[in-house]
Amino acid sequence: AEDLFKCDVFVFVASKGIPPVGSGVKDVRMYQFENNSKIVAQYARQARKENFKGLFAVVSDPVDPLAKTAWLESNKDDSGVLDYQGLRPEQVHGFGLGVMNARAAYFAKRDERFKRFLTEGRSFGPHGQDLVVADSITDYNDELSKELTELTVTANLHMRAIGFKPFIAPAYSSGAISLVLMMRGEWHCGSVFLGGIYMGVKNRYTAFGLETE
């Protein structure tokens, strides 16, 4: 444990679990946040204690609130007072948007109406209900974008409804693939600190710092 932060990238994937299918829990992400925020806070405080200078990557759900929790908790002293002596905002990065972008691409490949998304589209926001999918950033169509957003947001609910927990797709699209792209300095989908919150956008790390599209 003492060597945990002797690295360039720390990836937080711990989770206390999710409600079983059919449990009746309506807000799964709030349930996850209540449990996982306590765990991420513990590691964020350890990162502060060890003066960690690398990247603190959050993959566990709900990504965006957990990323902010990690940043805030690392910046509190032993009395719980914010002193901003911990992780810098750009050191914390959330990885949850990748799978939403991939789900939007899945529907775009199956429906001609959405095909522009594959070359002109973008996904913004959190890994959850407040996601915004734009069918095109050059010739935006509000009606099509809202329909594609709805399909994307509810895709995991359909998986749960037929008895599966949708974890493989996020592990690949939001986790493994996006992490590799980030470490290569390539464009990828992820949550970065914008205006006081962690917001999912297309971004990359450069020699001059974080760049958002």
Q: Where would I find each of the regions flagged by the language model?
A:
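Short beta-strand segments
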Residues: 13, 58-59, 194
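Hydrophobic, Leu/Ile/Phe/Ala-enriched alpha-helical segments that form helix-helix packing faces
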Residues: 1, 43-51, 70-75, 176-183
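Structural signal for hydrophobic packing residues in well-ordered secondary-structure cores
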Residues: 11, 18, 74, 180-187
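Long, compositionally biased stretches enriched for glycine and/or charged residues
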Residues: 100, 108-213
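Conserved active-site and cofactor/substrate-binding residues in soluble primary-metabolism enzymes
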Residues: 35-38, 42, 65, 171-178
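Short, charged/polar micro-motifs that form catalytic or ligand-binding hotspots
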Residues: 30, 56, 60, 163-166
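Rossmann-like NAD(P)-binding element
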Residues: 2-55
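Rossmann-like dinucleotide-binding core of oxidoreductases
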Residues: 55-139
